[in-house]
């Protein structure tokens, strides 16, 4: 995944020092794009170990429309703990917007169900979009959506996905986001009878926190290894029917984990 290493090098070489909401400080660049061909291997970073369990369970949690961390905690995933209230609630974050966007007329819009149906019915549509950025509810969210809009595209029997991420924690968050949306693209492709195409990751404010700079430099000393292969249970034909057991990652041989603190 040289695309990711190129981004690290760009930020370390060109990044502007900026203040941020957390008070940590960042090096930041604005506007960056990475492309991953999903038939070339599953884009799971190999220059440090990533937690597949957390990536898959978070995605399944989003698709459930859930916004309470109980499901995650029950499966040993703690990545949202810092933002939850005393009841485990996060407000109307990703899952709520994906599955039950509140319309002005009182309806609840299931964007995921709608986009899957539209891909099947009208694959050439330029409206194959899901957004989590709901200005009317931002203030109610524990954390406004960082990966805020994605669009599908069908050509030559393949499904591609482009994600726009307004705010990108490049050391901790971005590797996670790449794997998550690559997997989502594969899942949607399967249930719509298509093959996976590309995952395209477009970043707005792409930043390294000041307490992640040494870790990023360490990671750049490591040589990327061959990408693993993700297989999905072919019997699942409903986007909401996937379980953790339906995913198997083969030949994942990463370098060791690199510890870094989350900026809250």
UniProtKB/Swiss-Prot annotation:
The keyword rRNA-binding does not apply. Its EC number is 2.1.1.45. The active site is at residue 146. PROSITE patterns: THYMIDYLATE_SYNTHASE. It catalyses: dUMP + (6R)-5,10-methylene-5,6,7,8-tetrahydrofolate = 7,8-dihydrofolate + dTMP. Pfam families: Thymidylat_synt. (6R)-5,10-methylene-5,6,7,8-tetrahydrofolate binds at residues 169, 263. Keywords: Cytoplasm, Methyltransferase, Nucleotide biosynthesis, Transferase. It is found in: Cytoplasm. GO terms for molecular function: thymidylate synthase activity. Pathway: Pyrimidine metabolism; dTTP biosynthesis. DUMP binds at residues 21, 126-127, 166-169, 177, 207-209. GO terms for cellular component: cytosol. One of its GO terms (biological process) is methylation. Catalyzes the reductive methylation of 2'-deoxyuridine-5'-monophosphate (dUMP) to 2'-deoxythymidine-5'-monophosphate (dTMP) while utilizing 5,10-methylenetetrahydrofolate (mTHF) as the methyl donor and reductant in the reaction, yielding dihydrofolate (DHF) as a by-product. This enzymatic reaction provides an intracellular de novo source of dTMP, an essential precursor for DNA biosynthesis. PANTHER family: THYMIDYLATE SYNTHASE (PTHR11548:SF9), THYMIDYLATE SYNTHASE 1 (PTHR11548). Homodimer. HAMAP family: Thymidy_synth_bact. Belongs to the thymidylate synthase family. Bacterial-type ThyA subfamily. This is Thymidylate synthase. It comes from Rhodopseudomonas palustris (strain BisB18).
């Amino acid at each position: 995944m040289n695309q990711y290493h190129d981004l690290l090098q760009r930020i370390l070489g060109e990044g502007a020092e900026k203040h941020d909401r957390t008070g940590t400080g960042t090096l930041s660049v604005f506007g960056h794009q990475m492309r991953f061909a999903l038939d070339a291997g599953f884009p799971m970073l190999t220059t440090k170990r990533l937690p597949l369990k957390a990536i898959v369970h978070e995605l399944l949690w989003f698709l459930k429309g859930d916004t309470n961390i109980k499901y995650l905690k029950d499966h040993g995933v703690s990545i949202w703990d810092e933002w939850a209230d005393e009841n485990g609630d996060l407000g109307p974050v990703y899952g709520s917007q994906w599955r039950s966007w509140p319309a002005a007329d009182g309806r609840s819009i299931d964007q995921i169900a709608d986009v899957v149906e539209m891909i099947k019915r009208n694959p050439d549509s330029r409206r194959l979009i899901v957004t989590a950025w709901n200005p009317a509810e931002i203030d109610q969210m524990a954390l406004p959506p960082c990966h805020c809009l994605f669009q599908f595209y069908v050509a030559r029997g393949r499904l591609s996905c482009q994600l726009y991420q307004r705010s990108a924690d490049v050391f901790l968050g971005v590797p996670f986001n790449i794997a998550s949306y690559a997997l989502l693209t594969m899942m949607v492709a399967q249930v719509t009878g298509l093959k996976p195409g590309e995952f395209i990751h477009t970043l707005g404010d792409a930043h390294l926190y000041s307490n992640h700079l040494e870790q990023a430099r360490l990671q750049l000393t490591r040589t990327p290894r061959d990408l693993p292969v993700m297989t999905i249970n072919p019997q699942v034909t409903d986007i909401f029917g996937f379980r953790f057991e339906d995913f198997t990652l083969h030949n994942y041989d990463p370098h060791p984990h690199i510890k870094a603190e989350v900026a809250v």
